[in-house]
Every structure is written in structure tokens, then in C-alpha cells.
UniProtKB/Swiss-Prot annotation:
This is Chaperonin GroEL 1. Keywords: ATP-binding, Chaperone, Cytoplasm, Isomerase, Nucleotide-binding. HAMAP family: CH60. GO terms for molecular function: ATP binding; ATP-dependent protein folding chaperone; isomerase activity; unfolded protein binding. One of its GO terms (cellular component) is GroEL-GroES complex. It comes from Chloroflexus aurantiacus (strain ATCC 29366 / DSM 635 / J-10-fl). It is found in: Cytoplasm. The gene is groEL1. It holds the Pfam family Cpn60_TCP1. One of its GO terms (biological process) is protein refolding.
Length: 544
């Protein structure tokens, strides 16, 4: 396939055209006074969104050279979203500002590689300054403020604060669509896993089709149980204490299942058999979690234990076990608190070291089941487009809140970026072009506040000058401009706060992508082929 090439200034200008097209569409959504963007879908109603990364992901340009610039900028937005879950519009605005100023000085003869080195050194200093100014999340009010800022909706902010308070910072919160028009919340207490009862005959509540056992003894094994002889010794010991007996195993079938069902129908034993959750190594880990939560032992041949060797001491205990045909919940396991805490710390350590997003998600779920709980936020709306837009905002706000709990918060409204600018004065560089890179960063860091003000119909330069003057007069670095009220004041006190993780990720990713664009000297793409005109079908235009 033949290629076409652009070099030097022509190449960089083509990239900039692509960057500008994406950034100009995305930055209209910045801030509480930002506008929505409607995205056409080939089928169904258009998507109306206030989310920067959703807008960026939809953009594909016809010109292949411009499209390269667009895709690079999308990478800055997407990476920020992946790491912090929010801040995509800020990253896009910063990257565009750096590219715009950088291309001017490169065209004037500056060395692009030295410029990039200055940008990279500056970014390191900025990230350190942003982290140093962090304030930990103190209470529910801080969480509500972070979520409200992200979603531009106080109802969503209060909802997320309430749910997070209930399940704890290690809890799992998922967002689903609801059939109604309002928000709904669902909580799951205890440990729930997605395996239900093996036989419908085990149901204790016919109306709700649930099997509910109080204070049961729980046998946990990774084996398949087919013969009743394997569990008869432990069954006889359990019956001396209680009738309530739960089996969590790879499977229970054949004679073993038939005997349990018959004896349940006779009233001899109230048995519940459930398949073990997960597969492979994950199943072993989850069974171990259940064992620690309930104070039992996993009976496994891997550790030299057979089912007929199980004793009462090997069985777990819980206040209640409830099973439906789809899932099982263990409420108030009687496990040792110290052992549960040790297991939680072990899972946290695994989360910190894993590189796989899938593994991290599964570990987070296990952690939530042991440590906190599971909550579902159901989003409702009158129409389909509004529902999707609302769900996006709830997901963004949730990500921003988690990021805030993790690394702390800084003043929002673009103030944290302006406050970080003096950190660039301490960066030592050897070459003049590196200093130019630092100068570009100084100008770019003001851009988010300029755009926030512009979206609110104000003059960005005047707002920035007033913010700096008031900060100096009052000796308060948290002072900024509230675009909703049109008033100056402490951003922290007004609840206008951003997570540190979001702010630093936006800076890092914007500098990374802008540096790549500024140091590009050639672009290569395929020459589009002219498609031959379609030939008319056989017998076209003839009468028969």
C-alpha cells in the first residue's frame, strides 16, 4: 500500500488541527456552567452528554493526518479517565494549551527535544506541589462536595456520600439503570456470591422462593460430593447440635443430594447445598475467604484432608444464610476478627501489586465482601437519553470520590493548578529552550480557569488577576471564583474541591501527549484508494 508523508511544520500543523477539533468540542463541557454535547447515533436517539471523555471517544476525523492529532489527544483524556475516573476535560484543555504555545516556539526555531525536557521536569515539580497541598477527606460532607462538583448535581453528591458512608471506602458500589424516574439504593449486608441452592426442594420460604437458615453450621469444600458416606460422619455430629446445615462444595449430586432432600422433606435435617463461587484459583481464594469469615476450614485434598475426616471444629458458623436460585448471602459470619483483618490486608496488598484491571476488579469485590458491603445505585429518568447522561454523571462522580478518598483533595475551580505555578520557579534547567518549556506550562496552567470563566460568560484574564490579588491580600491560597454564584471566596469552604489524583493525572497525561506532538517531525499514512464505480447488475436497464 503506497504511503503519503508530511514533514516538519506541515506535519505538526496537521496534528494541531486535529487536537483543536477535539479540544474545542470537549472544553464546552467544562465546569458547572459548561454546555452539553449531543452525539448522533445511527440507531435510536442521540446521546446527550456533559462528560469530556465520552465526547472525545466519539470523534473520528476524515483527514488521516488530522485524525492522528485527534487520537493522541483522546489518549490523554482516556488515560486520565482510566487512572482517576474524572478530569478528562481538564487534561484536554491543558494539552491543547501546551501544544498551541509549544508549536509557536518550535516554529520560531526552539529545539523541540529540549522543550519537551523542560515540560517533563516542570510536570514532576507540579505533581509534587499538588500532592504537597493535599488535604485528606475528613467526613461525609467532603465526599458529597467532591461528587457534587464532578456531577454538577447536589442530589447525586448527597446520594454517593450516603451510599459510601454505608458500605465504607472498601465497599463495592455499582451503577445500574432503573425502570423508574428517581434514584434508588440497594444494600447487601454480609457476603454475597452468585451461586444459588442446588435443589428447589431446599426452599424454606415458598412465597419468596428462598432458603433461609438461622445459626447454621457450614461445611466448606472444593470437592464434588456424590456419596452420602463422605459426609455422614460430620452430618451425625451436626445433628447432635442443630438441624441447620449448609454445604458449600464444587457440586452436590447423586445419592448425596437425594439423601439430603429426602431427609429435609421428612424434617430430619434442614439442609442447604450451594455450589462454590468462581472458577480455578479464584474459587480456592473465595472459599478461603468464606472459611475465614465464618471461622471454618476448607476441606481440600490439596492439604491432605478428606471429607470423612471433617469435624465440628472444621465447620463455619454464621447468624444466617439466605439462598435464592441465583445467589447466596452469608450474614454475620462468626470468624475471628483478627483473622478477617489479616485477610483484608492480604487482599489490599494484592490489589496494590496487580497489573491487571480484571484481577484488580475481582480483588476489590472480594475485599468489599469481607470488609464493607455491596451497594447498587439505580438511576432513573423520564427518557432514554436523559437516563444515559445521568448514569454517566453518577459513574464519573463515583470515580472522583474514590480518587479523593485515596489521595486527598485540593481546591477546585482551577485554583490548585494556579497555586502550583510557583513550584516551577525552583526547577533547575541548563538550557534556554528548557526554560521556555517551563514558561509554556505557566501559561497552560491558567487555561482551565480561563475556560471555566468563559463558559460562565466572564473574562478569564480578569478572573485570574482578581483571584491572585485576593489570595495575596487575604493570605489564603484556597480563594477562587465560584462560577455558579459569581462570588470570590475559599473553594474548600464552598465545597468546590477536586481529588488530587484527578488533578495530577490531568497534568501528567497532558504534558506526555503534548510532548509527543511537539517532537513529531514526520507523519506517515496510507494513500486512500479510489473505489471503482459499481458496475450495473446483469441485464440492467433491459425490458423482459
Amino acid at each position: 500500500m503506497p504511503k503519503q508523508l508530511y514533514f516538519n511544520e506541515e506535519a505538526r500543523r496537521a496534528l494541531k488541527r486535529g487536537v483543536d477539533l477535539v479540544a474545542d468540542a470537549v472544553k464546552t463541557t467544562l465546569g458547572p456552567r459548561g454546555r452539553n454535547v449531543a452525539i448522533d447515533k445511527k440507531f435510536g436517539s442521540p446521546t446527550v452528554t456533559h462528560d469530556g471523555v465520552t465526547v472525545a471517544k466519539e470523534i473520528e476525523l476524515k483527514d488521516p493526518f488530522e485524525n492522528m492529532g485527534a487520537q493522541l489527544l483522546k489518549e490523554a483524556a482516556t488515560k486520565t479517565n482510566d487512572v482517576a475516573g474524572d478530569g478528562t476535560t481538564t487534561a484536554t484543555v491543558l494539552a491543547q494549551a501546551i501544544v498551541t504555545e509549544g508549536l509557536k516556539v518550535v516554529a520560531a526555531g526552539a529545539n523541540a527535544m529540549l522543550l519537551k525536557r523542560g515540560l517533563d521536569r516542570g510536570a514532576e515539580a507540579l505533581v509534587a506541589a499538588i500532592k504537597a497541598s493535599a488535604v485528606p477527606v475528613r467526613d461525609r460532607a467532603d465526599i458529597a462536595h467532591v461528587a457534587t462538583n464532578s456531577a454538577a448535581d447536589s442530589e447525586i453528591g448527597e446520594l454517593i456520600a450516603e451510599v459510601m458512608e454505608k458500605v465504607g471506602k472498601d465497599g463495592v458500589i455499582t451503577v445500574e439503570e432503573s425502570k423508574g424516574v428517581t434514584f434508588e439504593k440497594e444494600y447487601t449486608e454480609g457476603m454475597q456470591f452468585d451461586r444459588g441452592y442446588i435443589s428447589g426442594y431446599m426452599v424454606t420460604n415458598v412465597e419468596r422462593q428462598e432458603a433461609e437458615l438461622d445459626e447454621p453450621y457450614i461445611l466448606i469444600t472444593d470437592k464434588k460430593i456424590s456419596s452420602i458416606q463422605e459426609i455422614l460422619p460430620v452430618l451425625e455430629k451436626v445433628l447432635q447440635v442443630t438441624k441447620n446445615f449448609v454445604i458449600i462444595a464444587e457440586d452436590v449430586d447423586g445419592e448425596a443430594l437425594a439423601t439430603l432432600v429426602v431427609n429435609k422433606l421428612r424434617g430430619t435435617i434442614n439442609a442447604l447445598a450451594v455450589k462454590a463461587p468462581g472458577f480455578g484459583d479464584r474459587r480456592k481464594a473465595m472459599l478461603q475467604d468464606i472459611a475465614i469469615l465464618t471461622g471454618g476450614t476448607v476441606i481440600s485434598e490439596e492439604i491432605g484432608r478428606k471429607l470423612d475426616s471433617a469435624t465440628i471444629e472444621d465447620l463455619g458458623r454464621a447468624r444466617k444464610v439466605i439462598a435464592t436460585k441465583d445467589d447466596t448471602t452469608i450474614i454475620e459470619g462468626r470468624g475471628d476478627e483478627a483473622a478477617i483483618r489479616a485477610r483484608i490486608e492480604q487482599i489490599r496488598a494484592q490489589i496494590a501489586t496487580t497489573t491487571s484491571d480484571f484481577d484488580r476488579e475481582k480483588l476489590q469485590e472480594r475485599l468489599a465482601k469481607l470488609a464493607g458491603g455491596v451497594a447498587v445505585i439505580k438511576v432513573g429518568a423520564a427518557t432514554e437519553p436523559e437516563l444515559k447522561e445521568k448514569k454517566h454523571r453518577v459513574e464519573d462522580a463515583l470515580s472522583a470520590t474514590r480518587a479523593a478518598v485515596e489521595e486527598g483533595i485540593v481546591p477546585g475551580g482551577g485554583v490548585a493548578l494556579i497555586n502550583a505555578i510557583p513550584a516551577l520557579d525552583n526547577v533547575q534547567v541548563a538550557h534556554e529552550d528548557e526554560k521556555v518549556g517551563l514558561q509554556i506550562l505557566r501559561r497552560a496552567l491558567e487555561e482551565p480557569l480561563r475556560i471555566l470563566a468563559r463558559n460562565a460568560g466572564e473574562d478569564g484574564s480578569v478572573i485570574i488577576a482578581n483571584v491572585r490579588r485576593l489570595q495575596e491580600e487575604k493570605g489564603d491560597k484556597t480563594i477562587g471564583y465560584n462560577v455558579l454564584t459569581g462570588q470570590y471566596g475559599s473553594m474548600i469552604e464552598q465545597g468546590i474541591i477536586d481529588p488530587v489524583k484527578v488533578t495530577r493525572s490531568a497534568v501528567q497525561n497532558a504534558v506526555s501527549i503534548a510532548g509527543m506532538i511537539l517532537t513529531t517531525e514526520a507523519l506517515i499514512t496510507d494513500i486512500p484508494e479510489d473505489k471503482p464505480a459499481a458496475t450495473p447488475g446483469a441485464g440492467g436497464g433491459m425490458d423482459f
